[in-house]
Amino acid sequence: MSAASAATALSLTPGWLRSEAMLDAYGVTEATWREALKKQPHFAISESPAFVGRAVVALAQDPNVSRWNGQSVSSGQLARIYGFTDLDGSQPDAWRYLVEVQDAGKPADVTGYR
């Protein structure tokens, strides 16, 4: 197969996405999303839809994107590798946070995860 016809297949998952549905569920907007922390403190690790969009852009611009073929990657994982950030300048790593903090029953603290 020539490089012109090569394809890469991967799975990209966002972290805890601040989608319109999530914002509506908490009665907040993208501008006021931190107010939702009163109801769900772990929502502090959430990411904007732009963050996963930036992951797609980074993949599209990578001439070596085939290294991801057959893999499942997260927006937080790719942010560390490609260096992009969320709208607030952070790099939320929701999946690591969910395992190490939320699932472990620890209080909400995004230090080292955002």
Question: What are these language model-derived features?
Answer:
Residues 14-24:
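Short, flexible catalytic-loop segment of classical short-chain dehydrogenase/reductase
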Residues 26-31:
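Short, hinge-like loop/turn segments at secondary-structure boundaries
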Residues 4-15:
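Conserved beta-loop-beta element that borders a ligand/cofactor-binding pocket
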Residues 24-25, 71:
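Residue-level signal for well-ordered alpha-helical positions
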Residues 11, 32-114:
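C-terminal helical subdomain
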Residues 1-4, 60-61:
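Alpha-helical segments that scaffold the active site and NAD(P)H-binding pocket
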